[in-house]
Amino acid sequence: MRAGVRIGIDPGDARIGVARSDPSGFLATPVETVRRGKGDLARIGRILAAEEDEGATVLEVVVGLPRSLSGREGPAAAKVREFAGRLAARVAPVPVRLVDERMTTVSAEAMLRDQGRTGGKRRAVVDQAAAVLILQHALDTERATGAAPGEIVEET
């Protein structure tokens, strides 16, 4: 397992969930929800800079790529690919990777519902919870296979 903090991103149309791993790459935890739109990439860049200011090495950013249950990519995936390309340009030289995020928002909603969070309380953190699930899956995959997860994103 490669050492270093990873940042997990769940990009939605209105909000972006952000999570981080510990430096050993064992556990993903929520960071914040960023409002989608003007300044969103700058905010994510500041999150990475804050990690580095605290002495962490940010190894990579992992972005969830929505696919259908059959594995096909639709319009939402195209939007995420475009976002990830812009993010890669913003955070370079830190690499950005796309990983399969099938069902993470549904799983995050169910998890929060099971914890008794309802309505606005759930909406406020569901994107962070989805980012945690995306990042944790990437960490677990790397630990199991020994290979970096997903596909690398080229800057746009």
UniProtKB/Swiss-Prot annotation:
Physiological role: Could be a nuclease involved in processing of the 5'-end of pre-16S rRNA.
Compartments (UniProt record): Cytoplasm
Disulfide bridge map: none
GO BP annotations listed: rRNA 5'-end processing
Main enzyme class: hydrolase
Pfam families: RuvX (PF03652)
Protein family per UniProt: Belongs to the YqgF nuclease family.
Name of the protein: Putative pre-16S rRNA nuclease
Cited PANTHER family: POLYNUCLEOTIDYL TRANSFERASE, RIBONUCLEASE H-LIKE SUPERFAMILY PROTEIN
Organism name: Nocardioides sp. (strain ATCC BAA-499 / JS614)
Documented EC number(s): 3.1.-.-
Phylogenetic lineage: Bacteria, Bacillati, Actinomycetota, Actinomycetes, Propionibacteriales
Xref: InterPro entries: RNaseH-like_sf, YqgF, YqgF/RNaseH-like_dom, YqgF/RNaseH-like_dom_sf
One example GO MF annotation: nuclease activity
